[in-house]
UniProtKB/Swiss-Prot annotation:
Keywords: Cell membrane, Membrane, Methanogenesis, Methyltransferase, One-carbon metabolism, Transferase, Translocase, Transmembrane, Transmembrane helix. It comes from Methanocaldococcus jannaschii (strain ATCC 43067 / DSM 2661 / JAL-1 / JCM 10045 / NBRC 100440) (Methanococcus jannaschii). InterPro entries: MeTrfase_F (IPR011307), MeTrfase_F_su (IPR013347). Pfam families: MtrF. Pathway: One-carbon metabolism; methanogenesis from CO(2); methyl-coenzyme M from 5,10-methylene-5,6,7,8-tetrahydromethanopterin: step 2/2. Belongs to the MtrF family. This is Tetrahydromethanopterin S-methyltransferase subunit F. One of its GO terms (molecular function) is tetrahydromethanopterin S-methyltransferase activity. GO terms for biological process: methanogenesis, from carbon dioxide; methylation; one-carbon metabolic process. The chain crosses the membrane at residues 46-66.
Length: 68
């Protein structure tokens, strides 16, 4: 008797690989989402900082020129 050869795919191992792949893709997309949130918060903070600096520097300069 020889070794039996089967053309049937091993469905359980394929499902296991798919589940692992879905898990890893989920982690990658979660990390990307968290990173984009951090980047948008950093950009928002930068914009608020620039506007605040312009206002805080503009008020004394405006008063200085108005008092002349």
């Amino acid at each position: 008797m020889g070794v039996e050869v089967s053309n049937k795919p091993n469905v359980s191992s394929i499902q296991s690989y798919v589940e692992d792949l879905e898990y890893k893709v989920g982690l990658i997309t979660r990390n990307r989402g968290l990173e984009s949130g951090t980047e948008s918060a950093g950009t928002k903070g930068l914009i608020i900082g620039v506007v605040s600096a312009i206002v805080l520097m503009g008020i004394p300069l405006a008063l200085y020129f108005l008092m002349k």
